[in-house]
Amino acid sequence: MKDRTQELRSAKDSDDEEEVVHVDRDHFMDEFFEQVEEIRGCIEKLSEDVEQVKKQHSAILAAPNPDEKTKQELEDLTADIKKTANKVRSKLKAIEQSIEQEEGLNRSSADLRIRKTQHSTLSRKFVEVMTEYNATQSKYRDRCKDRIQRQLEITGRTTTNEELEDMLESGKLAIFTDDIKMDSQMTKQALNEIETRHNEIIKLETSIRELHDMFVDMAMLVESQGEMIDRIEYNVEHSVDYVERAVSDTKKAVKYQSKARRKKIMIIICCVVLGVVLASSIGGTLGL
């Protein structure tokens, strides 16, 4: 009788290896989802901080000379947003590189598709929050600029929008204020506010520059991911046209048929069209 001990031992070793691989993969995905939750939490914090920034902007604009505490709180929020945004960007980049490595090895699995979907979703949410932050900063800059222009008018100095923009870009506030006579308390207050708003704009533009490269990098990533989403949306939009045309053609055809046959034809056509659309959308999503 043939001794199958070695064969059985080899089969057991093979099963053990498969089990180890399976356990390792499960452990890897557990760690991945922990990363996802951490990134999602950071993005939610960013969103909350952006809302706080809006409130601080309103408080600063409401006071001709805002107190130092309010200005410091805004600076702290700005620093926190920068720190959190860089952290999110770094983690998303790490996931992206991991995905690219597996794709380079021509690996395709359900786990990889899940990671790509999660990465795409988180990237989009991140860019949405940072876009809102960028819009908030731009709006604040415009409001500060308007206040400077109004205060210059109080001092008797009229400027065009282009002149004021040139002054802000050069940082040479003295061009407009050196020859203003300090002949009244109102003029002094106006000049103080001009200086305050100008300093706010300088800080703001520094913050915008610091985040610019990161924002462009992530926006380009999301734009490239959007091609797949756009393709799915295109299929869905056109499916509506197909269904509408199918129903219209069916109505014309069944004028000479019984009601029962009319219903049957409409149901068949709609089912076929919807089946094609669903297959197309699912295929596009899974990269088939």
Curated annotation (Swiss-Prot):
Matching InterPro entries: SNARE, Syntaxin, Syntaxin/epimorphin_CS, Syntaxin_N, T_SNARE_dom
Highest taxon in the source lineage: Eukaryota
Protein name: Syntaxin-1B
Coiled-coil intervals: 29-104
Role this protein plays: Potentially involved in docking of synaptic vesicles at presynaptic active zones. May mediate Ca(2+)-regulation of exocytosis acrosomal reaction in sperm.
Family annotation (Pfam families): SNARE, Syntaxin
Annotated signal sequence range: none
Known outcome of mutating V216E: In GEFSP9; loss of function mutation
Species whose genome carries this gene: Homo sapiens (Human)
Family, similarity comment: Belongs to the syntaxin family.
Cysteine disulfide partners in this protein: none
Positions of the UniProt region annotated as Disordered: 1-20
Bilayer-crossing regions: 265-288
An annotated Gene Ontology molecular function: SNARE binding
GO CC terms in record: axon; centrosome; cytoplasm; cytosol; endomembrane system; membrane; neuromuscular junction; nuclear lamina
GO biological process assignments: calcium ion-regulated exocytosis of neurotransmitter; exocytosis; intracellular protein transport; negative regulation of macropinocytosis; negative regulation of neuron projection development; negative regulation of synaptic vesicle recycling; positive regulation of excitatory postsynaptic potential; positive regulation of neurotransmitter secretion
t-SNARE coiled-coil homology domain location: 191-253
Description of how the protein assembles with itself and partners: Interacts with OTOF. Interacts with SYT6 and SYT8; the interaction is Ca(2+)-dependent.
Stretches of the chain found on the membrane's Cytoplasmic side: 1-264
Keyword annotations: Coiled coil, Cytoplasm, Cytoskeleton, Disease variant, Epilepsy, Membrane, Neurotransmitter transport, Nucleus, Phosphoprotein, Transmembrane, Transmembrane helix, Transport
